[in-house]
């Protein structure tokens, strides 16, 4: 694992004159290990600290430990409820302990988790709060909240507004020596570019250039992860690639990736988009004349396409299922899904406009 931040933390631990300060830095190091997916290393550190301070807890250290536990939960499974609980606890303790830097960092992570679950109202409040709490040199908090803002604008279809915030994310992450943040930037951009390419292909004329660019971004993200030793959420990268291959019409290449990695990806946090992934898997099977299996996957996609799914995933699922049913000669079902897709894409456009208004207000 290559990380300037890791080397800096190790040096700071060695130089710390105060034992509690050194242990807080060890907990911070565990946070970094969690973000790189090295969970055993992080848990070993935290277990030792918890045992050491069991009889005489320190609130600041407890806050760092809780943040690290939350990050282990988050990077083990995106959207895990335990992550929110642990990081909110760290936020509360750091506030009570009057540790503004840690408080700001926890607030930035809560904004990130709000984004993951698409609670944009809460996210906007956290964005405004973090920007007030974190000074310009608090690179950890500033890089995280800049990434939240960037990906929110990107999600809302306003890449021109996202770009300066992506640049700030890179600037703060580089200043911190934080390769995990730079890896997250590349990965999140790749997923959002893929989502936009998906919408272009399914609801518009289809833009081959956008799909090619999204594939380049996905490959860059995967290569950077390998370079710096990031192991977190490793099943998601091949599923991202499978989607792009399918969008490019390379169904014979996409299908093995789905078959090998889909179940694992669902356990790592992709379950919220199982509706779309099952529908796209069905489409790949249709194209390869696996009609019986395609029908089964289409039924699974319909069952997973609930009202609590993200709007863009619901719209994409209906669009893909319309194609699947049409290819299978089920024209009434195809027409129904086509109509539902049109309504869902319109609702998604409304959501995007609402999100832009929320984040604009948070930044004023």
Q: Where are the language model's segments positioned?
A:
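C-terminal non-catalytic interaction modules
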Residues: 1-15, 20, 287-364
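Short juxta-domain linker segments that transition from a proline/glycine-rich
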Residues: 1-68, 75-84, 91, 97, ...
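Helix-turn-helix repeat elements of alpha-solenoid scaffolds
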Residues: 1-10, 35-48, 77-89, 116-129, ...
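Short coil/turn linkers that connect adjacent helices within long alpha-helical scaffolds
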Residues: 14-20, 54-58, 76-77, 93-99, ...
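Tandem amphipathic alpha-helical repeat scaffolds
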Residues: 24-38, 63-79, 102-119, 141-158, ...
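Solenoidal tandem-repeat scaffolds enriched in leucines and small polar residues
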Residues: 122-220
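Eukaryotic tandem repeat interaction scaffolds
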Residues: 210-307
């Amino acid at each position: 694992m290559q990380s300037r931040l890791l080397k800096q933390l190790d040096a700071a631990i060695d130089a710390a004159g105060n034992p509690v300060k050194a242990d807080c830095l060890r907990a911070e190091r565990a946070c970094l290990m969690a973000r790189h997916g090295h969970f055993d290393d992080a848990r070993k550190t935290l277990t030792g600290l918890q045992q050491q301070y069991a009889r005489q807890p320190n609130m600041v250290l407890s806050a760092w430990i809780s943040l690290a536990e939350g990050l282990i939960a988050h990077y083990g499974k995106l959207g895990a409820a335990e992550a929110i609980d642990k990081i909110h606890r760290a936020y509360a303790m750091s506030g009570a302990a009057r540790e503004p830097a840690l408080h700001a960092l926890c607030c930035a992570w809560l904004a990130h988790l709000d984004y993951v679950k698409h609670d944009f109202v809460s996210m906007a409040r956290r964005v405004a709060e973090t920007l007030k709490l974190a000074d310009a040199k608090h690179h950890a908090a500033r890089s995280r909240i800049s990434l939240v803002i960037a990906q929110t604008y990107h999600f809302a279809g306003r890449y021109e507004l996202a770009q300066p915030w992506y640049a700030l994310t890179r600037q703060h992450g580089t200043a911190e020596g934080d390769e995990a943040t730079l890896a997250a930037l590349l990965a999140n951009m790749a997923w959002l570019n893929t989502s936009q390419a998906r919408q272009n292909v399914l609801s518009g004329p289809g833009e081959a250039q956008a799909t090619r660019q999204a594939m380049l971004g996905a490959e860059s993200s995967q290569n950077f992860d390998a370079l710096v030793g990031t192991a977190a959420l490793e099943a998601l990268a091949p599923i991202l690639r499978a989607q792009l291959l399918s969008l490019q019409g390379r169904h014979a290449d996409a299908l093995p990736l789905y078959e090998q990695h889909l179940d694992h990806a669902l356990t790592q946090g992709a379950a919220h988009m199982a509706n779309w992934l099952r529908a796209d898997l069905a489409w790949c099977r249709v194209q390869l004349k696996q009609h019986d299996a395609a029908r089964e996957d289409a039924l699974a996609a319909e069952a997973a396409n609930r009202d609590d799914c993200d709007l863009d995933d619901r719209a994409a699922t209906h669009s893909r299922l319309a194609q699947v049913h049409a290819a299978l000669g089920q024209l009434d079902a195809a027409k129904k899904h086509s109509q539902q897709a049109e309504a869902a894409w319109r609702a998604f456009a409304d959501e995007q406009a609402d999100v832009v208004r929320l984040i604009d207000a948070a930044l004023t």
